Amino acid sequence: MFDTVCTLPLSADLFSQALHPKEPVVSVGLSSGHVQTFRLPSDEVDSDDDGASTSSSRTGRGHIDTMWRTRRHKGSCRCLGFGVDGEMLYSAGTDGLVKAAKAETGVVENKIAIPLDKNGSVDAPTIIHALSPQTLLLATDSSALHLYDLRIPYSKVSARPEQSHHPHDDYISSLTPLPPSDTSTSGFSKQWVTTGGTTLAVTDLRRGVLVRSEDQEEELVSSVYIDGLPSSGTSRGAKVVVGGSGGVLTLWEKGAWDDQDERVYVQRESGGGESLETLAVVPDDLGKGKMVAVGLGNGAVKFVRIGANRVVSEVMHDETEGVVGLGFDVEGRMVSGGGQIVKVWHEAVDSGDGVNGNETGGKRAFGDDSDEDSDDGDDDDDSGDSDQENKRGDARKKRKKGKTPKRGGGQAVMAFHDLD
């Protein structure tokens, strides 16, 4: 279904990945505290001397450019997220800080101190999400969900969230906004679904936590919203798809949040399946129908057709490291991240019905990163040695980090501009 365009090596383990909403740009947050932003080769069509049209990204002649790179956090960068218009990039780290930087340059414009936990210790972040130009959501290890009004000029001394909720007993593992209602005047979401521990919850911007599901007796780790499904009976044609730690996808009917209504076995294994770490909706023109890409803890990416509720294809991101980041850029290319690599994939030319057999990635590997700890293009003063990680929080959130990274060998190496 997908072929690899390129494999991009990183200087440390990937902890977070974010795709720009309007441009072919990907940002990564690393265990070392670095944040790096890349511009991917455009999928624009070029004509050669024979009049044949080819895409530079498909032929491998395009360049991946490093827009900027900096040591953003003293500790690991746990999570990243672009603003709704793509102008700002928000990062949060185990140093207890949220930083808002210009996406184009990496220059920090604002900092927010994360509230301490009840013991007075740093409450490490798990998720950051810009719900609208006005509202930033931040989840932490202590199960807190903080809401910040971005119109207020915060300082790291006086910053306080406008609201704080605890929708789950355990840390929040995923957050998926629900689309605005038909009567919305702003056009931005005001409700969102979260997973944490063994429950799913729905929270409203004004009314707080609305509902929490029954105990699912399985850890829920990822979620995504999908609409455009057939409507029949009580079905509204929209569902939230949730990935579990035991290899099972559960489908939740929108508005019926007490319990799941369908199950899809993605990875069956004796003693329990692989954790479904991250989910992404496949664009309709690529998926040949409603489809969800599932990043697994064993490094595979599987494609599940919703409706038929079965796995139809699979590719391999990495043989030893789990998939941490997964999404589709504005040009429809899949971007997967995990371990110390990011891979960019395009639709296979011979994909036909959208289903290929087991494909392995890494057809082209671009040149390695020189990984100098420079802050070029950034006026932030983040420097010095890394503080010790919050070992408990990182080990809990990144269950696959104990594995030894395995770098692929024997791959062709292609040079490109401005990697560092």
UniProtKB/Swiss-Prot annotation:
Residues 39-63, 350-420 are annotated as: Disordered. It comes from the Eukaryota. It comes from Aspergillus terreus (strain NIH 2624 / FGSC A1156). It is found in: Nucleus, Nucleolus. One of its GO terms (cellular component) is nucleolus. Its main location: nucleus. This is WD repeat-containing protein jip5. Keywords: Nucleus, Repeat, WD repeat.
